[in-house]
Amino acid sequence: MNENETRKTNYAAIDIGSNAVRLLIKEIKEEQGKAHFSKVLMLRVPLRLGFDVFDIGKISEKKEKNMIRLMKAFRHLMKIYDVKHCRACATSAMRDAKNGMDIIKQIEKKTGVHIDIIDGQEEAKIIYNNHVEHMEDQKGNYMYVDVGGGSTEINLLSEGQLVCSRSYNIGTVRMLNNAVKDSEWERLKNDLAELAKSYPQTNIIGSGGNINKLYRLADKKNKKKMTMQVSVLQELHTRLKALSLEERMEQFGMKPDRADVIIPAGEIFLTIANIIGASYIHVPVIGLSDG
């Protein structure tokens, strides 16, 4: 390719989470030796696989059929957008489902879409690798926290360098199903308390649809730096928790699949913030599918 020529290529990522399944298509424009990324399409479908898995241990036949239908739809969309390469990743619900591997084989057979079931560590690292380029200020200590439906991924950064990646089976859908073990909460609290001793004055970088929504709902925030104080999140969480599901939907324009999980999401972020003594949360609006 000539140095002055522009080449455009579309790539896709599919994120099969415990609450929703997402398709993200991005265009990569290569110009004068530099790559520029732009979002072409983003679709979110609340399949809510975790409500089956964290209750009965497997994905129901109905949701399996819907998964296959959805992957067929995604495949057609990728053809329309002339996608050259796609990576599909399944996380916590598929990891835990007894029939997860069987469903993935069926999906590939019927749709041609290959799905990788990734572990929590890889999930955390994909999110981290995507995040690095979004952060202008890499000085100090940050804990990158991605709260999903089935698990919470944590990356600790110090002076822009990755210190460690951790994954915990604590997620919003798990909490709604009362499926989080006390031992998992203890593991998270003990781990973070130890990290806080070695890395004081750590603040949070929040990832996931719930923290994005909470940030948008917050009355007081720094729009330029995309941050909100933990105290502001606490006030908002208290206000939302006092409302019924229907009231949250009516007063804040939430969809049903957001109005229920936003409460446990707030609890997870606040628990982590209190353990490490964070004063604010930075919300860059990126997640697994962006990586």
Predicted ranges, named:
Residues A12-I14, R87, M143-V145:
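Short aromatic-hydrophobic micro-motifs that form the base-stacking/packing surface
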Residues Y11, I25, D52-V83, T91-N141, ...:
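Helical "lid/coupling" subdomains associated with nucleotide-phosphate turnover
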Residues R7-S38:
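N-terminal basic/disordered segments at the start of proteins
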Residues K34-V53, R69, K79:
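Conserved ATP-binding subdomain of kinase catalytic cores across diverse folds
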Residues T6-K8, S18, K139, G149, ...:
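A generic fold-level signal
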Residues D15-A20, V145-S151, S207-N210:
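A short acidic Gly-Thr/Ser loop motif
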Residues M1-N10, E194:
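Short, Lys/Arg-enriched, disordered terminal segments
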